[in-house]
Amino acid sequence: MAEVNISYVSEFILKGITDRPELQAPCFVMFLTIYLVTVLGNLGLIVIIRVDSRLHTPMYFFLSHLAFVDLCYSSAITPKMMVNFVVERNTIPFHACATQLGCFLTFMITECFLLASMAYDRYVAICSPLHYSTLMSKRVCIQLVAVPYVYSFLVALFHTIITFRLTYCGPNVINHFYCDDLPLLALSCSDTHMKEILIFAFAGFDMICSSSIVLTSYLFIIAAILRIRSTQGRRKAISTCGSHMVAVTIFYGTLIFMYLQPKSNHSLDTDKMASVFYTVVIPMLNPLIYSLRNKEVKDASKKALDKGYETLKILRLSK
């Protein structure tokens, strides 16, 4: 791509989810509530996993990083989105837009591969339980988390640099509630054909690689479960993977709908609704999915709440 690093646009205007005045206040309250639940849920999950020694296992190590990623990419999008409901003209500076796009891509791609790492962890736990502690050593776990972070950062940096080296010399209204690649390309007066190919290629590669790991892991897991003769053993194995399967289905289903459909079928309004789901709703759902279906997390949460309540009682009595 031979575009010169010159832009006639110093800021963008985010159109937001809706421009209907009667929906602004209800939407603000709804998304504020969702964001608060997201922050409390993910932060709470991270804290509980860190402080409870019973949860210092590979599965919860990955889960704490998933909660961190959900918290980060929701925070990169939701606060700015809510501004659109309380101001008439929601502007974002050129460089802030680049930063938001970079953060969003980094954490979204990281989540793809973290879910794959978690699927591999479940595969080892069910298919090779006797070798679990060796195969999922601390060093291996750190590598399975570090690689997604480093890879996603490099890919996000690459895409962000290319997108913001394009020339923006005309309209600056982004038909979206955050800075995303496709809506930005619609505003560029440069040739965006190569960039569109790169988006499709990288999105396809990331989803095919990560989903292949997930799918292969679960095929082996299902085969192992079918070989278990006792009903109780099968239930225990299924409960171990149930939460992760739900989270994977929701996340990948939304991304496939968003990025791997033909260009002729793309509607920015439809994409906007899909984006709301995976940038706002999924980060809220994940801690609920993993905690409500997990006895160990529920027990640890109850223990932490009881301990906090006892501490408050002691503080009150000491006054």
Curated annotation (Swiss-Prot):
GO molecular function, a single term: G protein-coupled receptor activity
Superkingdom of the source species: Eukaryota
Alphabetized PROSITE patterns for the sequence: G_PROTEIN_RECEP_F1_1 (PS00237), G_PROTEIN_RECEP_F1_2 (PS50262)
Residue spans, topological domain Extracellular: 1-25, 76-99, 155-196, 259-271
Cysteine-cysteine disulfides: C97-C189
Keyword Transmembrane helix in annotation: yes
One Pfam match: 7tm_4
Topology in membrane: Multi-pass membrane protein
PANTHER family in the record: OLFACTORY RECEPTOR
Name of this protein: Olfactory receptor 8U3
Organism: Mus musculus
